[in-house]
Structure formats: C-alpha cells, structure tokens
Amino acid sequence: MIITLEYVVSAFDQTAVIEDLDRVLQTRAGRRLEYLSIAWTSLEAIIGVGVGIVAGSVALIAFGADSIIEVASSCVLLWWLAEGSMDRDRVAHRLVGGCFFALGVYITADASMDLLKGEAPRATYFGIIYAAVCVIVMPVLARAKRRVAAQLNSQALHADSHQSDICAYLSLILLLGLALNAVLDWWWSDPVAALCMLPIIIREGIAGLRGETCSHAHF
C-alpha cells in the first residue's frame, strides 16, 4: 500500500487537532475544579467563622479565615486557566506561594492568641462534624487538582493542590482540637498542634514566592 505525502500531512493535522481538543477539555476540567473549590471553601469560611463566633472558638474562626485564602488561591488559578500562558503560570505560582505564607501568619496569630488567653472554647459537636467532613473532602479535591495539573503541566495548579492538602491537615488538627477539648478539656491541644504545622507551611510559602515547584513536597 502506497502512503502519499498528503495522507501523512492529514494524519499529522488530525493528531494536532486531537491534542488541542484534549487540552481544551483538560483546561475546562481545571476550571470546574476551581469553581468547585471556590464554592466549597466559601461554605467553609461561612460555617467556620459563624460556628466559631457562636462557640467562642478561635481555632474555628481561624480555619474559616484560612478558607478565604483558599478562595483567593482558586481565583488566581482561574485567572491562569483563562489563557494558560506560561507567564501567567509563573505569576500565579508566586501568588499561590504568597497564600501559603499568609496562611502561616493566620495560624501563628490564632495559636498565639489561644495560648495567651488560656480560654477553652465551648464544646461544639456541629463543629466536630464540620471538621470531619472537611477531612474527607479536601484530600479528594487535592488529588483531583494534581491529576489535572499533571495533564496541563501547570505548576500553579499543582501548588494549589498542596494548599488543599494543608487545608485537609488543618481540618484534621481542628477535628482533634475540638474533640479533645470536648472530651478531655485539653484547651491547649489545638494551638500546639497548629504550631507544629508551621515549618511545612512556611517552606511551601518560600518555595512558591521563589517560583519553585512544590512537587518535591511530601505531607
């Protein structure tokens, strides 16, 4: 069978079209993930701050404030996904790194205030359920972001997935803190555990501000 030059060129054109279509679909998947992330973390912020005020829990209020940073991070990623340029990817990656750093500031302020006041929040079983749901949802969202980030070769989306990982760890700390406070009256358990996470968060923030990849990080 004779393969003509026209046939070969046509095959290459079809391959290029398929690759372009795949990237469009992957970018749309990334946008959907970020819309979902914005919706979920906005709900986290409302519930966390609201329940925290009612229960007098600084940890819950801080966790809600963390969700605001998550929303900002997702908005940054939507900005990059709008065009997908490498320049935007680098800028977005640094902005996400700044969000990590801001997250560390929030946790430091929260934990220090809690330890200085020495006042335990009231037991809140709704808060415990809320934290447990976050522990389940955030790792699933982070894995989905990493999968799409690998397909798009986006460092910014990959960094954002690590921010979702950190949110999952914070929700686990929150869950343990609320549970220990409710069961054993250990008011100090939440701020001490939160401070233990600061080295990881600060390292990721510095890496992001330098424009370095976060793919080396392990949690």
Question: What are these model-derived regions, one by one?
Answer:
Residues 2-219:
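Alpha-helical transmembrane cores and adjacent cytosolic helix/loop segments
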